[in-house]
Amino acid sequence: MAIPGLRSVSALLAMEAGQFFEPAGRPGIARLTTQAMLRGTTKRDARAWSDALDALGASARLDVGSHAAVFSGQSLADDLGAYLDLVAETVVTPALAPESLEFVRAHTLAEIEEQKKDTRSVADQAWRELTYPPGHPFRTRSIGDEEVVRGAAIGEIRAHHRDGIHPHGSVLVLAGALDPGRAFELAERAFGSWSGGDPAGRTVAPVVLDAARRRAVVVPDKTQADIVLGWPGLPRRDPRFTKAQVANMVFAADTFASRAGQVVRDELGLAYYVFSTISGTAAQGPWAVRMGVNPENVERAIAVTFTELKKIRDGAIADDDLALARDKLVGELEVGRESPGGVAGMVLEAELFGLGDDHLDRYPRDIRAVTKADVVAIASALLPIDRYALAIAGPEIPPGR
């Protein structure tokens, strides 16, 4: 997508090789694979590849999310061809040498050890285990399972690259100072020989919580408790997703524009932070409220959050609150559209999940069209107050309510 007045181009290359497409029962393979891909190619080692990138004054990173592995970066428009060649070299012909796996394994295990001491990470993992059954791709954080990381073999890494990193289902988005025709030619030159693999495919059973589930995990030497309260959300392709985004904003997404955020943090001072997110991916990602609180305030913060949720479910939503939530979402969208990276991200989401070529233009109107009745219906259907998962991590936690 061409954006006038710029000298740079933002690039996003998404491949359906994230958590959702990992080998069953092997959480962590996707992340190990992408990290190993950055450790050199069949043409040059990691240092030489990095030097070539630096010579262009460009940036690049490769991350694994719940749905995709995403190569993201930026270069000057004049260097786009050379930049795409470097990206293709890493994606299509990584060396994936045994020593590369050992390097990323060591770093990943060190990160896992650090996360064991981090109350946010501990609470998030505990919540996932409460919510998702064994074998579900979202039961584990993207960093993976410690045993899988320790035992992963280079053959698994190469197999995941072969089976998951391929052009089928992959999307390249370029936004910024570019001529569309020329950009297509450069992309074709860089990736035209990329082949192999079959379209990714995986299905998981719907996740439904049958009761309230609660777990408290003691993390030594901590003074703050972190809370994750949530439910399995909606797949991004669900036609109700935009309504759910508005409901999320009304509920707790933001301390300025959301009820729980305002009351729990600003009015009552029960939390250091409060926010909620709804994950947009191929399956039911987390719809979760996250809070950091003084351990003495854990039960009250949870109770007040449920009180605000019950008000929403009962239809006690002020017109101003709904308008503020819609304005906040549209405002975030407009801010994103001011940068090439933001535009690229929106186009990428639309392409990955089949939201339509007019998604960027239609999305603000869809947000504005969400009514109070829509929010109540979403909260009633997807945020039951008697069926949820609640995880707390920190010092000794008071008994459950």
Region spans (language model):
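His/Glu-rich zincin catalytic helix
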Residues: 1-56, 72-75, 85-87, 158-263, ...
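A structural supersecondary motif
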Residues: 228-232, 252-293
